[in-house]
């Protein structure tokens, strides 16, 4: 099947005229027509005929002997919070307050995709403004998990993860503030890669928590993530947090026998993680040991303060970043007798419940009298944790563990308890807090036949070694091969 090929293989077949790019486009659009109405993946979509025309232009360049980009002809999906200049596509963050908004410019990562001849075909559903772990916070209804449509796909990049898992795109870009690429990848049985902070430009990404946000890759394998990442990474003068230089390109293999992995004792707590998740985590850690790698257990000593500090900082940054949305230029606008009332009514109608909760809590922790007690203290904790983790990753090559405490949960299961939903991030926020690269890869199935993810994290700028290790594991195992039965019979 065409969709079984890697991204590099697909491009090679297109470049050698073995595969017509229009055939790949038609295959993807056929799957969108078949599954999207049920699963609710896309927020906006480039019409099929336009994508075919763009694919034909790539085919013509190849026929004429012209060079084409590294991603030539690949249909790629984009999360709904990454700016795209296309009259057919919105950048609405799955929020009513941005309903109908069309970006006048491309995000740098989208510009890079286009320069590499990728076909950006649509924007995908998400938790509103990237705030959530289940995709239930979208103003346009949730995306459904293709492994079990009664369960969540994860969040906030749930639509992007489902697009890749179902073949409604061959790859996707999402954003990861506390696990929003890795957790949905885990829940959908694919690979999700969050690079080092600044390795991919944030210019054009609608901000949630500016010191935590990072664009990431959703693909079937680590090899595909590396291929996509290398095509779009680089220095960006439009992003003040961009790395000062491009990372070296992905190449070669890695010997697992030379590596040292740390499995935190806190990650093996049966009160936090489910039995299936612990079993898969321990099994893969044992497998690494059998391959000759060194795997040691060690206590971190700070997990209890990680989630509170993360949410104080992210809520504070969100309350500042979302102050710019007022209902004046686009989206929901409520008429009123005064400007203040217009702002209040428009924001109240335009933002969903979870977004309003985070704005209010963020405003509170930044308010006079509470700033130092909450925001100031949270940043002190962050600095402490960052130093501890960087010291740990000087001793070990990788930190390993679960991605999420459990398997995909049922819709509505955690809606009445926001704290239970926030704890979905307990294993994933560490990478964002410390600016480290991290990756989620499939690690088996639960007793209910639901995907389980395994996470690896390395020191900043060590992205390609992280990808190599994940690719090496996937080359020797088959956890990444199963596809959702709903979409692959």
Locate the predicted segments by residue.
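Short glycine/serine-rich loop segments
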Residues: 105-107, 111-235, 433-444, 450-453
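Glycine-rich, small-residue loops and helix-cap segments
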Residues: 17, 73, 115, 169, ...
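An N-terminal boundary/leader segment
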Residues: 1-54, 60, 290-292, 482-489
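A short helix-breaking turn/cap at a secondary-structure junction
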Residues: 194-279, 284, 339-345, 477-488
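Conserved hydrophobic/aromatic pocket- or pore-lining residues that grip, position, or stack substrates
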Residues: 28, 51, 79, 113, ...
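Gly/Ser-rich, acidic/histidine-flanked active-site/gating loops
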Residues: 3, 73, 212-214, 237-319, ...
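Enzymes and membrane/adaptor proteins characterized by extended Gly/Ser/Thr/Asp/Glu-rich
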Residues: 70-109
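Glycine/threonine-rich flexible loop motifs
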Residues: 91-100, 272-275, 371, 409-419
């Amino acid at each position: 099947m065409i969709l079984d090929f890697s991204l590099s293989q697909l491009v090679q077949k297109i470049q050698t005229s073995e595969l017509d790019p229009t055939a790949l486009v038609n295959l993807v659009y056929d799957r969108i027509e078949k599954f999207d109405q049920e699963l609710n993946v896309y927020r906006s979509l480039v019409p099929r005929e336009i994508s075919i025309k763009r694919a034909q232009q790539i085919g013509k360049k190849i026929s004429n002997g012209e060079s084409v980009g590294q991603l030539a002809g690949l249909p790629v999906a984009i999360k709904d919070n990454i700016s795209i200049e296309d009259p057919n596509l919105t950048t609405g963050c799955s929020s009513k307050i941005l309903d109908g908004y069309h970006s006048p410019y491309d995000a740098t990562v989208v510009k890079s995709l286009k320069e590499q001849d990728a076909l950006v075909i649509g924007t995908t559903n998400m938790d509103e403004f990237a705030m959530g772990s289940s995709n239930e916070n979208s103003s346009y209804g949730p995306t459904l998990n293709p492994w079990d449509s009664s369960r969540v796909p994860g969040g906030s990049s749930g639509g992007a993860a489902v697009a890749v898992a179902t073949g409604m795109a061959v790859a996707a870009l999402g954003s990861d503030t506390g696990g929003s690429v890795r957790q949905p990848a885990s829940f959908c049985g694919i690979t999700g890669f969050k690079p080092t902070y600044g390795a991919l430009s944030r210019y054009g990404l609608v901000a949630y928590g500016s010191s935590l946000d990072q664009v990431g890759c959703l693909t079937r394998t680590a090899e595909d993530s590396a291929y996509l990442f290398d095509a779009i990474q680089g220095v960006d003068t439009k992003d003040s947090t961009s790395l000062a230089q491009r990372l070296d390109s992905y190449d070669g293999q890695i010997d697992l026998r030379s590596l040292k992995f740390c499995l935190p004792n806190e990650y093996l707590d049966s009160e936090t993680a489910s039995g299936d998740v612990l079993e898969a985590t321990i099994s893969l850690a044992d497998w690494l040991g059998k391959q000759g790698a060194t795997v040691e257990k060690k206590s971190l000593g700070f997990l209890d303060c990680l989630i509170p500090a993360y949410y104080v900082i992210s809520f504070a940054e969100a309350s500042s970043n979302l102050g710019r949305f007022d209902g004046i230029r686009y989206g929901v606008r409520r008429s009123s007798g005064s400007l203040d009332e217009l702002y209040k009514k428009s924001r109240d109608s335009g933002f969903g419940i979870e977004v309003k909760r985070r704005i209010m809590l963020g405003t509170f922790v930044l308010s006079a009298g509470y700033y130092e007690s909450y925001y100031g203290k949270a940043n002190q904790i962050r600095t402490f944790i960052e130093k501890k983790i960087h010291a740990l990753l000087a001793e070990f090559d990788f930190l390993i563990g679960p991605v999420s405490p459990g398997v995909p949960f049922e819709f509505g299961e955690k809606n009445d308890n926001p704290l239970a939903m926030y704890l979905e991030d307990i294993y994933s926020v560490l990478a964002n807090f410390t600016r480290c690269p991290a990756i989620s890869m499939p690690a088996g199935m639960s007793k209910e036949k639901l995907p389980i993810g395994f996470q690896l994290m390395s020191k900043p700028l060590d992205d390609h070694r992280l990808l190599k290790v994940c690719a090496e594991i996937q080359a020797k195992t088959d956890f990444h091969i199963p596809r959702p039965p709903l979409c692959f019979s």
